[in-house]
């Protein structure tokens, strides 16, 4: 039984999570500089460690209903191609789960495409949707986000 740590966050009223090993840092919300002619899911950029960090809005990317949240956070994600931030409504907790507890998403009826989903985790009365960060951006979208 392998235990992994996941970062649980909210988009709207739903719980989502990602492996904590893919997360570099959690930032408080800060003003995002908008970029002209950018894809709708790319909210813009922020200054992060003296470089430019693209900010991906998962609510827009997944086509979810936007809710006003005063707890918005930016999760800084490490990828081989570079770093980017994902804008979330709030961050809930870091939780230890067993890999065996991650269920196959095939039976899932959800508002977001299954291609983004790594699996489902039952947590008390809630279902946490595990996001596959490798599939958030297509190759073409990565080129736009990282090459500008």
Predicted regions and their residues:
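An acidic, low-aromatic, low-complexity terminal/linker signal
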Residues: 1-148
């Amino acid at each position: 039984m392998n235990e992994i740590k996941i970062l649980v966050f909210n988009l709207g009223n739903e719980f989502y999570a990602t492996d904590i090993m893919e997360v570099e840092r959690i930032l408080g919300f800060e003003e995002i500089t908008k970029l002209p002619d950018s894809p709708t899911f790319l909210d813009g950029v922020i200054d992060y460690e003296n470089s430019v960090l693209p900010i991906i809005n998962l609510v827009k990317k997944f086509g979810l209903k936007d809710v006003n949240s005063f707890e918005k956070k930016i999760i800084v994600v490490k990828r081989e191609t570079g770093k980017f931030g994902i804008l979330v409504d709030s961050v809930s907790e870091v939780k230890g789960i067993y890999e065996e507890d991650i269920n196959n998403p095939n039976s899932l009826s959800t508002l977001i495409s299954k291609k983004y989903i790594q699996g489902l985790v039952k947590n008390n009365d809630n279902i946490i949707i595990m996001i596959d960060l490798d599939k958030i951006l297509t190759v073409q979208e990565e080129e736009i986000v990282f090459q500008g």
